A protein has these predicted regions:
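Contiguous surface segments at macromolecular interaction interfaces
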Residues: 1-12, 73-135
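A generic structural signal for short beta-strands and their flanking turns/coil linkers
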Residues: 4, 24, 45-47, 60-62, ...
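Intrinsically disordered, low-complexity segments enriched in polar/charged residues with Gly/Pro
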Residues: 27-29, 57, 105-106
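Short beta-strand-centered aromatic/proline hotspots
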Residues: 59-69
Length: 135
């Protein structure tokens, strides 16, 4: 099965990219939206996700890898969790404004379903965001 791509959101004041880098790996839990939780359940080991800072500095800042999928949320086993580790920081953050302005990203779930905290990213969207990070 091929690698799938995702986007996970975090408020940097609560848990930032730097926090993840310092920890090396973390349990991604506390998701209480059914669609987002189903996305967590669909993740497989080796899948990659964009790490998105929400609220302040809105933008994609890095790439993480799913290291342990299919875990129950320790606070409520009816919900899902995964373990993730940082892979790399983007050359530069890709802001939400840039994503919204890019016509090839008009259907990205980050824009269409703005409140969704865990979203699937299509291969073309993944590649385009990586291109934007290099410009």
């Amino acid at each position: 099965m091929s690698t799938r791509h995702w986007l996970i959101k975090s408020e940097p004041a609560a848990y930032s990219w730097d926090d993840l880098v310092n920890e090396g790996e973390t349990l991604w839990d506390g998701i209480r939206n059914h669609r987002a939780a189903n996305n967590l359940r669909a993740m497989a080991e080796g899948d990659e996700a964009f790490f998105y800072h929400s609220v302040t500095g809105k933008g994609i800042v890095g790439v993480v890898e799913v290291t342990r999928p299919g875990l129950p949320d320790p606070k409520d086993s009816a919900w899902a969790a995964v373990k993730i580790r940082p892979v790399r920081k983007l050359d530069r953050p890709v802001s939400l404004a840039e994503i919204k302005a890019d016509r090839s990203l008009s259907e990205i779930e980050l824009v269409r379903l703005s409140r969704l905290s865990v979203a699937e990213i299509r291969p073309a969207e993944w590649n385009r965001v990586l291109e934007l990070a290099k410009t």
